[in-house]
Amino acid sequence: MTVRVGVIGTGAIGQDHIRRLECKLSGAKVTAVTDVNQDLARKVANTYAKQATVYANDRELIAARDVDAVLVASWGPAHEASVLAALEAGKRVFCEKPLATTADGCMRIVEAEMAHGKRLVQVGFMRRFDSGYLQLKQALEQELVGEPLMVRCIHRNVESAESYTTDMAITDTLIHEIDVLHWLLNDEYQHVRVLYPKKTKHALPHLQDPQLVLLETKKGVIIQAEIFVNCKYGYDIQCEIAGEEGVISLPDVPAVRLCSNGRKGTEVLQDWKKRFEAAYDVELQAFIDDGLKDEPASGPSAWDGYVAAVTADACVKAQESGREESIELPKKPAFYQHSAATPEQV
């Protein structure tokens, strides 16, 4: 059996997913593609998936009989409509973040999925599938350091694009930490405050960089998250969790250590693609496997997408107010209580 996938959006991430579906992963093939740029869609299909039909829009693709599952990798504001259409058609859907650009939009997807009666949505929070984060999760579940007390995270990029704005430090960058820490700690966020350190000379006039986000969970864990998107030296992701009995940290990315000319060191990655390439493979294979077995989606859920959106909204509000802001979430529906895969299952 093969899961026949229709891909909406053939930009950079869409192309990456088409390539991995066709060339790296098992149990799936790309049978349909669409993009607002039809010439690009045809070019991508001809390059990676010659058998795929190019459709004029997402609705035609979703309705196609040879599409079992939908992968949404289009412009963020278009995600909600595509996901809702896929749910209406009863087709499972993998949606790159954001699930929707508003918390209300995410809730509409949650409600539509619950009305359908089966988990069909997986959100593209790939860090949950990264081997390093899986090791952290396993260590926490085995209580190797006791109860978590504090978390320190770092998210650094070489430089930001001219279009990158201060709020995007939350909605585009910190959103990954928001989700993965919610999953790691199995705890809900309660309060947030955002601090602005001295601004780097490398940031454009409209951008505040770096930023420091302080999150507090309902269990009292304090999270210090640094976002520095013009650090210049490389792409650097770190996470350290201090518990009652010890400290655990995200392992370093394996790299050759070079000793030469009186210096010793390793290469620093320059972008996110290499850092999380394997995680992208694993998350999409999990989505395919769920489809092959006709089981509910086991990856990050629509509810997780909603939690991330509500938390991000509060963080942006804290950016603007300069004060501590509350993060208020309704009770998690029973529909989503026991749906996430454990590290052993992934």
Swiss-Prot record:
Molecular function GO labels: inositol 2-dehydrogenase (NAD+) activity; nucleotide binding
Single biological process term from Gene Ontology: inositol catabolic process
Signal peptide feature range: none
Entry keyword set: NAD, Oxidoreductase
Domain of life: Bacteria
Keyword Lyase part of the UniProt annotation: no
Pathway: Polyol metabolism; myo-inositol degradation into acetyl-CoA; acetyl-CoA from myo-inositol: step 1/7
Region feature (Disordered): 322-346
Keyword Oxidoreductase: yes
Catalyzed chemical reaction(s): myo-inositol + NAD(+) = scyllo-inosose + NADH + H(+); 1D-chiro-inositol + NAD(+) = scyllo-inosine + NADH + H(+)
Pfam families in alphabetical order: GFO_IDH_MocA (PF01408), GFO_IDH_MocA_C (PF02894)
Feature: compositional bias, Basic and acidic residues: 322-331
Entry's EC annotation: 1.1.1.18, 1.1.1.369
Assembly with partners or alone: Homotetramer.
HAMAP family, per database record: IolG
Family named by the database record: Belongs to the Gfo/Idh/MocA family.
UniProt function note: Involved in the oxidation of myo-inositol (MI) and D-chiro-inositol (DCI) to 2-keto-myo-inositol (2KMI or 2-inosose) and 1-keto-D-chiro-inositol (1KDCI), respectively.
The protein's name: Inositol 2-dehydrogenase/D-chiro-inositol 3-dehydrogenase
Gene that produces this protein: iolG
